[in-house]
Amino acid sequence: MKYRIFSLFYIAIVFVTQMAAENGSHLWLRLPANAHAEISAPRQSPTLNIAVEELHQAWQGAPVQLVIQRDKQLQPEGFRIRHEDNKITLTSPTETGLLYAAYHLLRMQATGQNVTATQTTENPAYSLRILNHWDNMDRTVERGYAGQSLWNWEELPNTLSDRYKEYARANASIGINGTVLNNVNASPQILSTEYLQKVKALADIFRPYGLRVYLSVNFASPMALDSLSTADPLDKKVISWWKHKDKEIYRIIPDFGGFLVKANSEGQPGPCDFGRTHAEGANMLADALKPYKGIVMWRAFVYSPSDADRAKQAYLEFEPLDGQFRNNVIVQVKTGPMDFQRR
């Protein structure tokens, strides 16, 4: 009887220990370690070094060669996996594409697919694959049910959590290439020089993983940060303010992606406060970003509490503006007219 109790106790301890060791942070990347695979790349770079190291540690098959090569059938982040002569070749026009190829090869191994059977060609269905965080600067998360925000703004840029790299790795492993760091109910402070340096610290970690940073911005930021008397998108001083701010941003973060804007909805300021349309507001921001190839994601989920039909309101505001937005503006609609509807 004592032996049976001891055995059950021992099993329970082992089980609990294993449970404690698994915190879910590795997601699908629970990969073999120290496989010491033979991997070659055309050169060294932060991105290629990651691809080589991931394969070197976890790939258990034939030698792998990474090749940067133009291919009319491949988009910039597309890739091809080919097996011949007991060697696997990964090709892509870009380093990021090769990183995606490396993760795809490891995914095929993890799911038991026969890598030697066929040639694999992959192209992304969407060029922009962006996560939108609803994280506030005090680390609370709107509609967040899993603890505090990853971004510890008080400690940035001097203290860099290991979780930032793990976050970038997880995103790259499934092809995510952009992230909006902050809540659409944005604080103007995110555009201050102090906070742009904090954003830079994250962008520098994310960059080798092909992950670009975007920010939600408050439309009235010129009034909040520099005491302008207006945020009218047709006012020359306002236009100049955004141009100078964008110049500062791209000096600090050269590959910055652009802005996400929630305007004239749920109390947020916007162009309609100054008698302007959503198109005029979005286009002003887009023109300032255009020299840097940045984009504006302008939310179409807008409504006033005075009208219960939210779907109708959004339609009435945006349908007449069809065709008036700049080419680097994306009018971002929700899956449905209300929050959290399934596609």
Feature locations, PLM:
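Active-site-proximal beta-strand/loop segments in catalytic clefts of secreted hydrolases
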Residues: P42, I68-Q69, S92-P93, N182-V184, ...
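Acidic, contiguous N-terminal accessory segments
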Residues: Y10-D85, P93-T96, V115-Q119
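Structural alpha-beta junctions
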Residues: H56-P63, A110-T111, A203-G210, N283-V296, ...
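Feature activates predominantly on carbohydrate-active enzymes
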Residues: A51-E54, L74-G78, H83-L260, K290
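Hydrophobic beta-strand segments of well-ordered beta-sheets in folded domains
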Residues: A35-I39, R129-L131, N177-T179, F259, ...
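Bacterial N-terminal signal peptides that target proteins for export
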Residues: M1-F9
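A generic structural signal for short coil/turn motifs at secondary-structure boundaries
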Residues: P46, L90, S187-L191, Q268-D273
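Catalytic-core regions of glycoside hydrolase
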Residues: S227-R343
